[in-house]
Structure formats: C-alpha cells, structure tokens
Amino acid sequence: MDRWVKNILWILSIAFLLLLLVQTQRQPFSLECLALKNDPKDAPKPELKWSSYNDGSFQEQTENYLRENFAFREFGIRSYNQYCYSLWKKTCNSFFCPGKDHWMYYRPGVLDYYGREATRFFSSEDDMHKYVDHQVDMLNELRNILKQDFGIELLTFIAPDKAFVYPEHLPRMKHDTKIGVPAARFTQKFKETGFPNIDMTSWFAAMADTSSRLLFMPMDTHWTFSSAYGYDSLFRFMDSLNGFGIPRMRINGIEEAPYPGRQDDEATLNLLFKVKNDTPAYSADITVESDSTNRKPRVLFVGDSFIFAFESLIPRMDLISYYENWFYYDKVYKGFEKREYKIDEINRLRSILNVDYVVVYSVGYQWCRGTDGFVEDALSSIKDPEKVEVALMMNEIEAKPYLMEMIREKAEDKGVTIEEMLELDAKWIIENEKR
C-alpha cells in the first residue's frame, strides 16, 4: 500500500512539474486578468543568438522572462493581492494607500496630509524652511534672468492633491506637526516674494465643497474633466504675465457619459477582479477661441504626470504651437509627436531658451523634492556665457530647414544623434566666427 501511494505521488509530482514547464514555455492556459497600466515593463521571450550568448544578455533576458512568466505566477500573485484587498483592505503596492468607501490614494499624499511625508526629507521645521526658501530664491533668480535677458516667463503651479481635496475618505493616521507641509511653505514664499504661482490644491478643495461632481475618481489620483478648469486658469494666468495673446479656452459644459469613469490606479493594484465603480465618467466640452490678435506660444512643462490630461483631454494644438514635457526631470518628450529622450541626451539650456514660457509644476507632496534639480541645473547653465552662446546658435540653426537637413545627413554618417550633431556644428560655427 505504501509503495502504491508513493508511486502515485511520484507520478503526480512529475505531472505537476511538466505542467509548470509547459505553462512557462507555451502558456496553453490563458488566464484573463485586468490589464496593467501606467508603466509596465515587458519581459519578452529571449532569442538565442551568438552575440547575445557571448555578451551575457541572453542569460539576463532568460532570467527576466522566467521571473515574470513562470507557470501560474501571475494568477498566484493576483489571487494573493485580491485576498489582501478584499478581506483586509490592504495592497501589496507600497505606493498606494486604501481609504474609506473604496477610495484609493497615493501613500506619499496621505503622509503629506498628516504632516509625516516631510520627515523623510527634513530633520526639523527650520531645515525644511531653509530648503524651501532657497529653492524659491533660486526660482526668482532664474525668472529674473529669463525675463530680463530673453523675454521668457517662468512660473509654477501646485497641482491639486487628492488627499487635501477629499480628506474625508482618508484612512485614519496620527498627525505629525513637527515639520509641516513643504507645499504650504512654497505657496507662502511664492506669495511673499511675488513669484507667479497658482496653488490649485486649495482652489480644488474649495470647489469640491460646492461641486455636484467628483473632481477625482475614487480609484484614481489624477484629474480628468476637472483638468479643464486647471488648464484654463493656467493659460489665462500665463497670458496675464506678459500680454502674449494666448488663445482663450472656453468650457461650454460638462457632459456625463453612460459608463463608469476611468480608474487607472486600480490596474496597478494587480487584482483579479475590478473594484466597484459607480462614479460616472464626465467630459468637458472645450473649444478654443482665436483671432488675428492671438498667438500660440511655445511652452516647456517641467513636472509630473498631471500633464497627461493636457495631452489627452485638452485641444492643445489650438492653444500652443510647440511644447516639451520634461517628465520628472528624467524623460523628455519633444513636440506633439512626443519624440522621446533621456534628460541627459538633450541640451537643456537650448530647450529653455527656445520657448516663451517655462512652467514648473508638481502635485503637492512632491514639492518635498523641490524642482527635482531643474532650477539648480538651469541656473548653472544660464550663468555660463559659452553655454548660452552655443544654445542660442543651436536654436538659430534649427530654425533653418535646409541646415537641419544637412545636420541629419551628417549625424547619420557619423553615427551620432541629431541633437549631438547640432551641438557640434553650433560650436564649430562659433569658433570659426571668432577667428
């Protein structure tokens, strides 16, 4: 009897291992799960080549593939995540913090509301004040140089923080009042020094008290239809700084859709089933008014993911002629076609000097990090006459299509990027003009 049981267990073990192997390699059992959103990383099946074997990349790709595709790994992980969320209202994604009534928040935003996020960055209230005050001083210095020497406007806005707009759904947590909220200090110093800034968090909090529609979806932390109010105010504010003549947005109404609103953050929880969503989707009916007296500006946005609503919901091509998005001062997206670069792959000063407005923004809790290094880098570059000369020459060359065609051909011949070739030619022209 014992031998018979052992044989059965042995056969079942072999069959189970074969099932895992087949599922890993061929995946015959397709499990329908909620699609992941935001920024998932693919782990493609590796292809064995002599070059990839020789340089070790095949081994690395194989390990990544097996790590992500081993048998029923995804189903197992999602099942555990669903168990934690359904029974205990907990998530296995440390960035998210479940609130009451199926509301979801970013954990740093919740900590910021309770005064605890700043403790990760500063040792005391005085330390935080010194940091913020220095950041504001640098922004004012950069603004003065850009405005006086180049006619470029620099401004900021603090994007609305869901935790401060709808605190009634937050989880309970102890307040820490030793250091304070950096975004509030930034707002205060901007006002005291006269730096142009819009604090959208306090504005949206006031709007939420009277609005019959939710300004944020319960399971999403980004603005949707409400972004129309934010960007309308932003562009009106920009135009008021210098009378540029920016076309005017007109919000003709808010329409309710017959389906639930987007809840992109839900997909990052990696659950098996959708979370209950009774909140309808809303869309803003937006038109842009323009005549012969209006001009469409060039704009550089330096900030976070609150720009996505501008790219998907606002008729931006009717408002502006060109824009760049410096996403977390890491990735760069140029133009309406969103040509992608790393921040270190471009001449940042020439981008700054090639626009009419520079808009630095971020949601409230992220002001703990100031401008993520933007203002320090920009000040250092703009105070260097040689860097300014090269940047201006690059922009001058780029404005001439026939020269840019030559740049593209030379870049292809030399095996460098167009940006690198453009900078090399700008330096060559400057050196020859000085001879």
Where would I find each of the regions flagged by the language model?
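Extracellular glycan-modifying ectodomains
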Residues: 1-435
